[in-house]
Amino acid sequence: MNALEQARFNMVEQQIRPWQVLDPAVLHTLQHIARELFVPAAYQALAYTDTEIPLGHGQTMVAPRIDARLMHDVALKPTDKVLEIGTGSAYLTALLADRSHHVVSLEINPELHANARKNLQRAGINNVDLRLEDGSAGAADISALLMPLC
């Protein structure tokens, strides 16, 4: 196990499980989606720490335990279509995509949108429709609505 894999393992064991996120499918997703691919270069060393990470434009990545709890609570099924409002770095988008059929993610900021697209491509995630769009307009044909408020 390399250092990043060990950090990911430690994140799950020391941050996620204590928050009573115990669903094996969610834990598997958190274990195999490389969070470091979604963290700005200046903050790579913090990818698996229990802290918010600045993305610029007043936005942050929430601590991993928050994403984990959201994933646990929405209890996605493989057939679900998800609308996410506020793509940010696309880490949560990647988690959602791993647990659902398709994700539509709306981001209003052009720079965050472009970075999110690159991040998802690097991670090999292709069941996401990223849109540069104001989320207040909404979208149809969605099984679950997740609006990160953190």
Segments from the language model and where they lie:
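Short, surface-exposed glycine/acidic/tryptophan-bearing loops
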Residues: 42-55
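Conserved alpha-helix/loop element of class I SAM-dependent methyltransferases that forms part
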Residues: 13, 47-50, 61-80
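Short gly/ser-rich anion-binding loops that grip negatively charged ligand groups
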Residues: 56-64, 86
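A short alpha-helix capping/helix-coil boundary motif
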Residues: 5-7, 50, 71, 94-98
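Conserved nucleotide-cofactor-binding alpha/beta core module
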Residues: 75-150
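N-terminal auxiliary segments of SAM/dcSAM-dependent transferases
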Residues: 1-42
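Alpha-helix N-capping/helix-start residues
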Residues: 23-24, 64, 110
